[in-house]
C-alpha cells in the first residue's frame, strides 16, 4: 500500500459508492474503520474489494490474546491487505494476533499487521494524567514500537512526528503508518499531532492516512491529487 490511504469515514455503502465513483478507473488504497465496518458488517469489505481497491481494516483490536487470535482468523478470511491492534494490549496479544492472521490466510500470504502506539488525538498531558504513563509521549511511542517489533508485527500506527525515530530504532522496513495528515489549508479538527503530506514524507512516514482533507473536499479528486503530488514529490 504505497499510495496515500484514504480514510472512508462514512456510515453507509451508498456514501462510499458515491465517493469511489468519482475515482472511476483508479485503484486506491482505502481505510475501512469502525464506523463503516460496524454499520455494514463484512459485506462492506467484499463490495470494496470487488472494485479492486487495497483495504486497511482499522478496527484496533484490544482484548485477551485468545480472543484477538480468534478474531484475526476471521478477519484474515476477508482478504484485506492490512489490519491493526492496540500495542497497549501487550506483546502476547500482538503475537497471538499475528498467529491468527497466519492461520486464517488460506493463500499463505497474510495481511500486514500494525499496532497503534498512541492515538494522534492524545497529547502528552492527556497520556500522563489519564493513562498514568509518566514518561514523555515519544518514549511511550518508542516503547510500544519496540514491543511491536519484538512481537513480529510489520509496523506501527504513529504520528509523523515520531516516524523518523521509529525508523532509526526499528529499521526502514518497519512500517510507520501515520494518520493526522492534513493539507495546509485544512483544519486539524480533533487531532492534535497533525502534519501535511509533504512534511510526513520528509520526516520519515512510510504510509499516510488522509480522511477529511479528501472526503470533505469540494473536489475530492483534486484534493487527492494534491495529496499524491506532495507525497510523491
UniProtKB/Swiss-Prot annotation:
Pfam families attached to this UniProt entry: OMPdecase (PF00215)
Pathway the protein acts in: Pyrimidine metabolism; UMP biosynthesis via de novo pathway; UMP from orotate: step 2/2
Biological processes, Gene Ontology terms: 'de novo' pyrimidine nucleobase biosynthetic process; 'de novo' UMP biosynthetic process
Molecular function terms, GO-annotated: orotidine-5'-phosphate decarboxylase activity
GO CC annotations, alphabetized: cytosol
Catalytic activity: orotidine 5'-phosphate + H(+) = UMP + CO2
EC number: 4.1.1.23
UniProt binding sites for substrate: 9, 31, 58-67, 120, 182, 191, 211-212
Domain of life: Bacteria
EC class (word): lyase
CDD domains per the UniProt record, alphabetical: OMP_decarboxylase_like (cd04725)
Active site, renumbered: 60
Keywords assigned: Decarboxylase, Lyase, Pyrimidine biosynthesis
Subunit structure: Homodimer.
HAMAP family named in the record: OMPdecase_type1_B
NCBIfam families to which the protein is assigned, alphabetical: PRK00230.1, pyrF
Function description: Catalyzes the decarboxylation of orotidine 5'-monophosphate (OMP) to uridine 5'-monophosphate (UMP).
Family that this chain belongs to: Belongs to the OMP decarboxylase family. Type 1 subfamily.
The name this protein goes by in its record: Orotidine 5'-phosphate decarboxylase
Organism this protein belongs to: Listeria monocytogenes serotype 4b (strain CLIP80459)
Amino acid at each position: 500500500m504505497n499510495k496515500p490511504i484514504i480514510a472512508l469515514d462514512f456510515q453507509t455503502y451508498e456514501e462510499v459508492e458515491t465517493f469511489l465513483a468519482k475515482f472511476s478507473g483508479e485503484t486506491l488504497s482505502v481505510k475501512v474503520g469502525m464506523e463503516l465496518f460496524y454499520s455494514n458488517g463484512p459485506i462492506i469489505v467484499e463490495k470494496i474489494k470487488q472494485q479492486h481497491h487495497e483495504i486497511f481494516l482499522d478496527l484496533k483490536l484490544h482484548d485477551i490474546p485468545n480472543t484477538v487470535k480468534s478474531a484475526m482468523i476471521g478477519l484474515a478470511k476477508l482478504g484485506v491487505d492490512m489490519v491493526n491492534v492496540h500495542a497497549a494490549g501487550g506483546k502476547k496479544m500482538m503475537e497471538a494476533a499475528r498467529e491468527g492472521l497466519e492461520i486464517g490466510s488460506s493463500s499463505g500470504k497474510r495481511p500486514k499487521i500494525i499496532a497503534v502506539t498512541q492515538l494522534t488525538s492524545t497529547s502528552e498531558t492527556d497520556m500522563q494524567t489519564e493513562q498514568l504513563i509518566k514518561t514523555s509521549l515519544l518514549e511511550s511511542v518508542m516503547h510500544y514500537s519496540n514491543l511491536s517489533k519484538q512481537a513480529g508485527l510489520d509496523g506501527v500506527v504513529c504520528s509523523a512526528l515520531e516516524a523518523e525515530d521509529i525508523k532509526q530504532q526499528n529499521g526502514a522496513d518497519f512500517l510507520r503508518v501515520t494518520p493526522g495528515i492534513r493539507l495546509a489549508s485544512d483544519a486539524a479538527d480533533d487531532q492534535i499531532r497533525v502534519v501535511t503530506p509533504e512534511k510526513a514524507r520528509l520526516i520519515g512516514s512510510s504510509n499516510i492516512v488522509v480522511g477529511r482533507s479528501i472526503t470533505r473536499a469540494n473536489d475530492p479528486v483534486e484534493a487527492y491529487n494534491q495529496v499524491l503530488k506532495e507525497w510523491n514529490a
